[in-house]
Swiss-Prot record:
Function: Squalene synthase; part of the third module of ergosterol biosynthesis pathway that includes by the late steps of the pathway. Erg9 produces squalene from 2 farnesyl pyrophosphate moieties. The third module or late pathway involves the ergosterol synthesis itself through consecutive reactions that mainly occur in the endoplasmic reticulum (ER) membrane. Firstly, the squalene synthase erg9 catalyzes the condensation of 2 farnesyl pyrophosphate moieties to form squalene, which is the precursor of all steroids.
The protein's Enzyme Commission number: 2.5.1.21
Gene: erg9
Pathway per the UniProt entry: Terpene metabolism; lanosterol biosynthesis; lanosterol from farnesyl diphosphate: step 1/3; Steroid metabolism; ergosterol biosynthesis
Protein name: Squalene synthase
Length: 460
């Protein structure tokens, strides 16, 4: 990781903290109480998805939020290992009917289930679901039915096979379709229903499915250790059995090289969906929807680069740095930037790829495909033209050309002044902390520095 990239991440973190004001619908008194509580539940279940959902435009934002909460409720039932199968299966299969029942709640989740509270207050979600237009409700209901059936099938399979529910790569694709691909398909239908995107997007099922599969497969790779400790095995036997006779042996230090080769095989499988993700993003025309879809996809390719040939995957949950995540959020605002970020992380994977790995060729081919698709979607010559046009536009704005004059009114000047004050105070505070730490170190280790010591360094 270069120093320049680290500095850029720090800059993005400061910019995000100081100037990025996220909508606070969960605390806004002007928002109806039920909707407010739904936003609070959204924050509780997923901070990352909450950020991108809240940035969606009116008319689609609440539909996507309810869609997410409904499927998160379904997922919470599936993930709960304390629920007996005879209790779990009917709930999963009938969940699409349950969301039509006013007042329904569920209090039998395990005490350690992290999203337990969502089901305890699920009547709030149902009430807002019933307030959506019929078109939105039909999309959510249909996807919930398909997903519930798929989850029930794989839950019963895991029960029969001591936690193993995925045997072949075909099973793997099918499972990921049920738990994530359907989310991508449902979102495409919601976007088309809102009229904010082309109606034909609702029929782009293959690439919509890939959008979800890419995210899910990356998460399954990253969560190896967490899932293994919970006796949940989502890596397909068809892949891991080539490297070990027991799934748990991948954790053993003696098998580290075989484990990394297995990880490479899983990475190659996930990369097959990256090109579809880029093609899907190229079809979006609404800025907020583009951001909503692009940010998780870039996060996924960044995570894949972080876990690739990383032995820590088998011991802990590997995540990208916070500064890296913020940098992705700020930059994933157009197709050019997204292609550039995909290329950056794809090249990180290609750089770590080694000819000693039996999957070297597969990884190289998939990385090459991403390069080709990025070039076809946004050729290099157009990137240079885009950069020049963008710089020219900024220059015109600064000069005050056209109808948009770069003259700040008093209110804007006051806001900028306050922001600069905050930045200055933050910098001074950091320097103060550094000085205090140095003082403590000098005191503890009895270090004495005299002015003559500085003179000997010939600094002045």
């Amino acid at each position: 990781m270069s120093l320049a990239n680290r500095i850029e991440e720090i800059r993005c973190l400061c910019q995000y903290k100081l100037w990025n004001d996220l909508p606070s619908y969960g605390e806004d008194e002007n928002v109806p109480q039920n909707i407010r509580r739904c936003y609070q539940l959204l924050d509780m279940t997923s901070r990352s998805f909450a950020v991108v959902i809240k940035e969606l435009p009116n008319g689609i934002r609440e539909a996507v939020m309810i869609f997410y909460l409904v499927l998160r409720g379904l997922d919470t039932v599936e993930d709960d290992m304390t629920l007996p199968l005879d209790k779990k299966l009917p709930i999963l299969r009938d969940f699409y009917k349950t969301i039509e029942v006013e007042g329904w709640t569920f209090n039998e989740s395990g005490p350690n289930e992290k999203d337990r509270q969502l089901l305890v207050e699920f009547d709030v979600v149902i009430k807002e679901y019933l307030n959506l237009s019929e078109g939105y409700r039909n999309v959510i209901s249909n996807i919930t039915k398909e997903m519930g059936d798929g989850m029930a099938y794989y839950a019963s399979l895991a029960e029969k096979n001591d936690g193993f529910s995925v045997e072949t790569i075909e099973d793997f694709n099918k499972y990921c379709h049920y738990v994530a691909g359907l989310v991508g398909i449902g979102l495409s239908r919601l976007f088309a229903q809102s009229k904010l995107e082309d109606p034909d997007l609702a029929h782009s099922q293959a690439i919509s499915n890939s959008l979800g599969l890419f995210l899910q497969k990356v998460n399954i790779i990253r969560d190896y250790r967490e899932d293994f400790d919970d006796n949940r095995h989502f890596w397909p036997r068809e892949i891991w059995s080539k490297y070990t006779s027991s799934f748990g042996d991948l954790c053993l230090p003696d098998n580290s090289e075989k484990a990394l080769e297995c990880l490479s095989d899983m990475t190659a499988n996930a990369l097959t969906h990256a090109t579809d993700a880029l093609v899907y993003l190229s079809q979006l025309k609404t800025q907020e929807i583009f951001n909503f879809c692009a940010i998780p996809q870039v996060m996924a390719i960044a995570t894949l680069a972080a876990v690739f040939r990383n032995p820590d995957v088998f011991q802990t949950n590997v995540k990208i740095r916070k500064g890296q995540a913020v940098q992705i959020i700020l930059h994933s605002v157009n197709l050019k930037n997204v292609c550039d970020l995909f290329l950056r992380y794809t090249r990180d994977i290609h750089y770590k790829n080694t000819p000693k790995d039996p999957n070297f060729l597969k990884i190289s081919i998939e990385c090459g495909k991403i390069e080709q698709v990025s070039e076809s979607l946004f050729p290099r010559r157009f990137r240079e033209m885009y950069e020049k046009a963008y710089v020219s536009k900024l220059s015109e704005q600064k000069k005050g050309n056209g109808t948009q004059k770069a003259i700040l009114n008093d209110e804007q000047k006051e806001l900028y002044r306050k922001d600069l004050q905050k930045l200055g105070i933050s910098i001074l505070f950091v320097f103060f902390i550094i000085l205090v730490c140095l003082a403590v170190i000098f005191y503890v280790f009895n270090i004495r520095i005299h002015w003559s010591d500085f003179k000997e360094l010939n600094l002045f």
